[in-house]
Amino acid sequence: MEAIAKHRFAGISPQKARLVADQVRGKSVDQALEILTFSNKKAAVLVKKVLESAIANAEHNEGADIDDLNVAKIFVDEGPIMKRIMPRAKGRADRILKRSSHITIVVADR
């Protein structure tokens, strides 16, 4: 039994979000929530929200017992990139890349 939750177009770069995703991969949901709660990273807040949604999906849609769930899969894909311009000296301009992410979490029974 598996339950999936996604956060598409999350406003954080995939590189930063993957640092947090790697910390909770394969852990039980209780342990993962504890790790995310005490993490100081912005991505931890986003990943925690998706994990809580996946747990709720498992409980509501599949009738799963929360105590038996673990993070089976978690991955962060690259979303669209907004390109912005920052003016520089002597009429030049630099390109700013505002990256976004698609965060996907699959929880399953142990």
From Swiss-Prot:
Keywords: Ribonucleoprotein, Ribosomal protein, RNA-binding, rRNA-binding. One of its GO terms (cellular component) is cytosolic large ribosomal subunit. One of its GO terms (biological process) is translation. InterPro entries: Ribosomal_uL22, Ribosomal_uL22_bac/chlpt-type, Ribosomal_uL22_bac/org-type, Ribosomal_uL22_CS, Ribosomal_uL22_sf. GO terms for molecular function: rRNA binding; structural constituent of ribosome. Pfam families: Ribosomal_L22. This protein binds specifically to 23S rRNA; its binding is stimulated by other ribosomal proteins, e.g. L4, L17, and L20. It is important during the early stages of 50S assembly. It makes multiple contacts with different domains of the 23S rRNA in the assembled 50S subunit and ribosome. The globular domain of the protein is located near the polypeptide exit tunnel on the outside of the subunit, while an extended beta-hairpin is found that lines the wall of the exit tunnel in the center of the 70S ribosome. Belongs to the universal ribosomal protein uL22 family. Part of the 50S ribosomal subunit. This is Large ribosomal subunit protein uL22. It comes from Aliivibrio fischeri (strain ATCC 700601 / ES114) (Vibrio fischeri). The lineage of its organism: Bacteria, Pseudomonadati, Pseudomonadota, Gammaproteobacteria, Vibrionales. The gene is rplV.
